[in-house]
């Protein structure tokens, strides 16, 4: 589908008339999100990848952290197809873990640590 062509579901979406020259669709590569980040890191080594509370991580450092986390998960026995629950606040380490799991083919199930106990129990049961 061309970027400027609407699919049948979009033809009844009146807000699209206000998009102007903005494409209706973006083309994305058929790769994992971790692979997309790693490819970007090849080109943008020293460019800021994450900025958090005054600390900036370059793409080079991001890849190092992803690789370290991935090695740790593999050492724990995590493998492709596994689902791993991560209960962390929105900090860089949560990002490293998510990409690391994606890189090894596992799935990150992210839970916000301020969720109620009943919600956390529900989420943990859902991922089994």
Segments predicted by a language model, with ranges:
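Flexible, non-catalytic linker and terminal segments flanking ANL/adenylate-forming cores
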Residues: 1-30
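Structural core segment of the AMP-binding/adenylate-forming
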Residues: 1-4, 76, 103-128
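Generic hydrophobic, helix-prone segments enriched in Leu/Val/Ile
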Residues: 6-16, 53-56, 110, 115
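Residue-level signal for pocket-adjacent positions within structured domains
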Residues: 19-23, 45, 106-109
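Conserved AMP-binding/adenylate-forming core of the ANL superfamily
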Residues: 27-30, 38, 46-99, 116-121
């Amino acid at each position: 589908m061309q970027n400027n062509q609407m699919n049948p579901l979009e033809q009844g979406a009146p807000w699209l008339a206000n998009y102007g020259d903005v494409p209706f669709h973006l083309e994305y590569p058929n790769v994992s999100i971790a692979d997309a980040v790693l490819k970007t890191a090849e080109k943008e080594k020293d460019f800021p990848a994450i900025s958090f509370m005054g600390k900036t991580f370059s793409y080079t450092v991001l890849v190092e952290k992803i690789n370290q986390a991935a090695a740790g998960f593999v050492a724990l026995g995590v493998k492709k197809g596994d689902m791993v629950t991560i209960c962390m606040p929105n900090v860089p380490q949560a990002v490293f873990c998510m990409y690391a799991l994606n890189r090894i083919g596992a799935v990150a199930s992210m839970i916000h640590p301020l969720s109620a106990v009943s919600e956390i129990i529900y989420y943990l049961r859902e991922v089994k």
